[in-house]
């Protein structure tokens, strides 16, 4: 019975992990940080955003880090997913503790956007790097392979045309995101009803919010929406979506649902990020679309969907994006994006895990 130490702190990473587990033998035992049984911590306990938020929880993060290093002694291999600020130092300490411990990094840090030096650290401390973006392999010397994209395994619904019956609202998976995005989405929904008549409004809620008091999280205005825990099905049925930045934007693009990306960070966090990251776009679909058109990812002129960031974000901007988007062009180009990513990644990662465990 192989034991795998997992560090999956993000909601999206846990969706990918769940799909991966369906493709692994049932006798694989998971320990560490993930959503599920036998976890040391739930990813919800790491749900912080912004530099000040991290500083406020530094004691907990250091404690969890130390416990994960100790837990690695029980594992046959280590699987790290995303969350580079936590996982790269973790890889370093585990490798120092046991140089023979096999470490896989799946869902790589965005070294193409900032901190390119992290690529050297990853190759030094990890044994296999599973890249889910075709262009990011070029930032590594030898250990990175493009394995496909996990969303192409997970998405079961793809639009055949641009039609839809609902408006979908996805204000994020973190409390800080919801607090900023949801009030704007509510106002946009109300104005759209005044201008165009009633349309079904669907609020997509993260699956790990099940059992929680949603009214306490979203406020009284949640009553204006139908609630869905199935993002893919809801996007498939939608005419248009209003989405907080994140994996959901790429999901919408692959499914073929027109959308606008909306995001607003704390002013200090935004200014620090602007100094560290040189990108025109923050949406994965736009970044991939640049690469697809042979442009520098995140810095190209081509755009698949509108982005409303920081002071450019307003209710008026959301409404304008809804009204003016060229839906037919968007749908045609979203099909090209799906072809660019080529295939899913889950089986490839499962095979590589078996190889690292000497099971093949």
From Swiss-Prot:
One of its GO terms (cellular component) is membrane. GO terms for biological process: lipid A biosynthetic process. Its EC number is 2.4.1.182. One of its GO terms (molecular function) is lipid-A-disaccharide synthase activity. It comes from the Bacteria. It is an enzyme of class 2 (transferase). Keywords: Glycosyltransferase, Lipid A biosynthesis, Lipid biosynthesis, Lipid metabolism, Transferase. It catalyses: a lipid X + a UDP-2-N,3-O-bis[(3R)-3-hydroxyacyl]-alpha-D-glucosamine = a lipid A disaccharide + UDP + H(+). Pathway: Bacterial outer membrane biogenesis; LPS lipid A biosynthesis. Condensation of UDP-2,3-diacylglucosamine and 2,3-diacylglucosamine-1-phosphate to form lipid A disaccharide, a precursor of lipid A, a phosphorylated glycolipid that anchors the lipopolysaccharide to the outer membrane of the cell. Belongs to the LpxB family. This is Lipid-A-disaccharide synthase. It comes from Helicobacter pylori (strain P12).
């Amino acid at each position: 019975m192989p034991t795998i130490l997992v560090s999956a702190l993000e909601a999206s990473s846990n969706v990918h992990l769940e799909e991966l587990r369906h493709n692994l033998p049932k006798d694989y035992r998971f320990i560490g940080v993930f959503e599920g049984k036998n976890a040391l911590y739930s990813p919800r306990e790491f749900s912080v955003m912004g530099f000040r938020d991290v500083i406020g929880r530094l004691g907990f993060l250091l404690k969890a880090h130390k416990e994960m290093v100790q837990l690695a002694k029980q594992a046959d291999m280590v699987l790290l997913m995303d969350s580079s600020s936590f996982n790269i130092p973790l890889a370093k300490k585990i490798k120092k503790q046991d140089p023979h411990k096999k470490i896989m990094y799946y869902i790589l840090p965005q070294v193409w956007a900032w901190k390119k030096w992290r690529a050297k650290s990853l190759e030094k401390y990890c044994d296999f790097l599973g890249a889910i973006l075709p262009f990011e392999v070029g930032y590594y010397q030898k250990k990175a392979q493009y394995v496909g994209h996990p969303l192409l395994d997970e998405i079961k619904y793809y639009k055949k045309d641009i039609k839809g019956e609902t408006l979908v609202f996805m204000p994020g998976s973190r409390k800080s995101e919801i607090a900023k995005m949801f009030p704007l989405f509510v106002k946009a929904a109300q104005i759209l009803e005044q201008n165009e008549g009633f349309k079904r409004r669907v609020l997509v809620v993260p699956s790990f919010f099940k059992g929680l008091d949603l009214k306490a999280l979203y406020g009284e205005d949640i009553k204006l929406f139908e609630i869905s825990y199935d993002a893919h099905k809801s996007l498939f049925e939608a005419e248009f979506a209003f989405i907080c930045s994140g994996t959901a934007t790429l999901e919408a693009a692959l499914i073929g649902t027109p959308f606008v990306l909306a995001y607003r960070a704390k002013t200090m966090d935004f200014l620090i990020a602007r100094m560290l990251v040189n990108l025109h776009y923050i949406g994965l679909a736009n970044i991939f679309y640049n690469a697809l058109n042979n442009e520098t990812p995140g810095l190209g002129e081509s755009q698949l969907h509108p982005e409303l960031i920081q002071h450019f974000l307003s209710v008026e901007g959301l409404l304008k994006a809804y009204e003016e988007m060229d839906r037919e062009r968007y749908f045609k180009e979203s099909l090209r994006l799906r072809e660019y990513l080529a295939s899913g990644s889950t089986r490839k990662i499962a095979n590589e895990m078996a190889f690292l465990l000497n099971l093949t």
